[in-house]
Amino acid sequence: AGLDAMGRVPWSINGPILDLVQEAWQQGGTWPDLPSLHDFEIREYEGDDPEAKELHGRRNAKLRRKNAELHSLRCDTTLKLDIAERFRNDAFYFPYNVDFRGRAYPLPPNLNHLGSDVCRAVLQFAEPKRLGGDGLYWLRVHLANLFGLAKRSLEERHQFALDRHADILDSFSDPMNGKQWWLEAEEPWQALACICELG
């Protein structure tokens, strides 16, 4: 019954966040949770010293491994963003499975709400609900949690968000070129999604 209830929850893609992630991905560089589009440069050794040549060869071997890892991460990111783009305008559902400990996991491995920061940020409930009386309070607490303050008191976390109202508005109005306060979060893309809800 529990798995059925979870499987009946419709999800959708958070289009504005997906647009920002795609923009950051196309820019390359060092955006959080997105691999660089550029490989490390590998240069051939041009000297005569055998020890230096061996050291240089080991360095190049490490760089080749790093480039292979980057290639794998780029393929993974491309796949996740492609899946998100394909489902951009649709509601969809996750089937779940339970492991031997009784923990439920979504079956799709690439894009799900237990995935990376980017995966979690681009997903949202397809049937939004009003925040209710305490909803804004809890959304602010959630933002503080995304900044790594989960062990502080609820009031401290709420106050953290209140004290950063100007930063929240700046990140909401110009996330890519403003002060980019959201990048300071432990989970920056989720923080940006939360900021967009607060904005």
Task: Please report, for each region that a protein language model flagged, where it lies by residue.
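Non-catalytic nucleic-acid-binding interfaces of large nucleic-acid enzymes and RNP effectors
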Residues: 1-199
